[in-house]
Amino acid sequence: MISITEWQKIGVGTTGFGIFFILFGMLLYFDSVLLAFGNLLFLTGLSLIIGLRRTFSFFFQRHKFKGTSFFLGGVVIVLLRWPLLGMCLETYGFFSLFRGFFPVAFGFLGSASNIPFLSALFQRLQGTSSMV
């Protein structure tokens, strides 16, 4: 069993609220205040979950520099009240940063799902990479 500290539990909640505010801000026609608040909560929660040092080492790796610059640049653009452009930059940066994680996540969802259509879809999205 993996032990989770209280700070990590707070980080999971903060990240969840950040994702909620980002989605709610997009639902309300890219409300810049909700998007900015969601971005700040998401980044704060991520740093609470994995720690500041690991967060900085994740974002500032040499091969992830382009994704990091687009993601953090999008956050700054949203904070400057250009929400549509900022969210486009953030989305591109997010997919660039977490590109290696998606096959693992789809593989897990495919193996955890008992619904035949969804299982086949997630197995197809998984590609060649696997968890084992």
Curated annotation (Swiss-Prot):
One of its GO terms (biological process) is retrograde transport, endosome to Golgi. Keywords: Golgi apparatus, Membrane, Protein transport, Transmembrane, Transmembrane helix, Transport. It is a multi-pass membrane protein. The keyword GTP-binding does not apply. It is found in: Golgi apparatus membrane. InterPro entries: Got1, Vesicle_transpt_Got1/SFT2. The chain crosses the membrane at residues 17-37, 40-60, 69-89, 101-121. The keyword Iron does not apply. Residues 1-16, 61-68, 122-132 are cytoplasmic. It comes from the Eukaryota. Residues 38-39, 90-100 are lumenal. GO terms for cellular component: cytosol; endoplasmic reticulum; Golgi membrane; membrane. Pfam families: Got1 (PF04178). Belongs to the GOT1 family. May be involved in fusion of ER-derived transport vesicles with the Golgi complex. This is Vesicle transport protein GOT1A. It comes from Bos taurus.
